[in-house]
Regions:
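Hydrophobic alpha-helical transmembrane segments
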Residues: 8-12, 48, 75-80, 119-120, ...
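Residue-level recognition of pore/gate-forming positions within transmembrane alpha-helices
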Residues: 15-18, 54-55, 82-86, 126-129, ...
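Membrane-interface "cap" regions at the ends of multi-pass membrane proteins
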Residues: 1-61, 167-171, 183, 189, ...
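Structural signal for membrane-spanning alpha-helices in multi-pass inner-membrane proteins
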Residues: 18-25, 89-94, 136, 163, ...
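Helix-loop-helix module between adjacent transmembrane segments
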Residues: 53, 76-170, 231-232
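Extracellular loop-to-transmembrane helix junctions
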Residues: 2-26, 38, 42, 66-102, ...
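Loop-to-helix junctions at membrane interfaces in multi-pass transport proteins
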Residues: 2-3, 37-42, 46, 63-73, ...
């Protein structure tokens, strides 16, 4: 797997566009509330963009393809579970949380359980966000190392710089606008890639070579599937990153609508990665599982789409 100059050019332009959009929006941020909760003026689209842009990272794309390479359709549980969590958030959480006019989960818990609960929840929430960030970053580090020949340490530094640039200048508002642009790019590139993978699977008549478990959401066992679903739902509902998006909404209705729109965006986005993972398992079984998606993009997808 090697990148052409055009690949690198398109990748650079895409990164610049996503980060640049956030930097442009940051000029309108004038207060701490504007930074942390977008001035509580976000519409449903911005709420959805910030939520979806946060959850759809390396785990939802590269990680899903990696699992699909080994297990098939059951790799869909991450994005499917995230979407279900957003629906639950919109139904049960959005209105109640938004009406408190707070900014964090610990602040909300302090209202009912006191200062000790706030302190403890702050520590637990920070650890949870750290673990989530690590899980999302590992695929990115591996891909940067493979594509550009950098050491894991340098790849981690580069990824860290990009993540900081993504939100540093404008906070929640930058994350929301960048998230919308990021979702457009990912939807276009992934669904075209998924369609190509599915057509290749049909052309080569390889679908029949997979065991039945690869076409079953419960292919890894019902207990395992439910454990995946439960862990994703709990992780989403308890994570400050997603709750903060609700606090940034203009009205409770827009907060709930943003959650539902995010669910519509996130739920189907795992399917193209599943198709890619299954094709690569059949056609290029020597590929490292974590490099399944980038390898497919470079080798089988037009440069313009692959670069995105």
């Amino acid at each position: 797997m090697s990148l052409t100059f055009l690949h690198i050019l398109i990748i650079s332009a895409t990164v610049f566009a996503v980060i640049g959009s956030g930097f442009y929006v940051s000029r309108s941020v004038r207060s701490s509330a504007g930074y942390s909760v977008a001035g509580r003026s976000a519409g449903a689209s911005l709420v959805a963009g910030s939520i979806a842009g946060t959850v759809v990272g390396g785990g939802a794309t590269v990680g899903t393809a990696q699992l699909a390479y080994s297990f098939g359709l059951s790799a869909w549980w991450f994005t499917l579970g995230s979407g279900i969590a957003f629906i639950l958030m919109g139904i049960f959480y959005a209105k109640r949380l938004h009406n408190t006019a707070l900014e964090t989960i610990p602040q909300y818990l302090e209202l009912y359980y006191g200062k000790k609960a706030e302190t403890l929840s702050s520590i637990i929430s920070s650890i949870g966000i750290l673990l989530s960030a690590v899980a999302s970053s590992l695929p990115g580090i591996e891909i940067i190392s493979a594509l550009f020949g950098l050491t894991p340490f340098l790849s981690a530094l580069l990824l860290m710089a990009l993540v900081i640039a993504y939100t540093f200048f404008g906070g929640m508002k930058s994350a929301a606008v960048s998230g919308i642009l990021k979702m457009v790019i990912i939807w276009i590139s992934l669904f075209i890639s998924g369609a190509i993978a599915f057509l290749l699977l049909q052309e080569n008549n390889t679908l029949s070579s997979f065991p039945a478990s690869h076409f079953d959401l419960m292919g890894q066992g019902t207990d395992s599937a439910m454990a995946h679903l439960f862990s994703v739902i709990v992780g989403v509902l308890c994570t400050q990153t997603y709750i903060q998006c609700i606090f940034s909404a203009d009205t409770p209705l827009k907060a709930a609508s943003g959650c539902f729109i995010a669910a519509l965006i996130v739920i189907p986005i795992g399917l193209p990665s599943v198709a890619v993972g299954m094709y690569m398992h059949a056609a290029e079984p020597e590929t490292l599982p974590i490099l399944v998606l980038p390898t497919f993009l470079v080798n089988h997808v037009p440069v313009l789409i692959a670069g995105l």
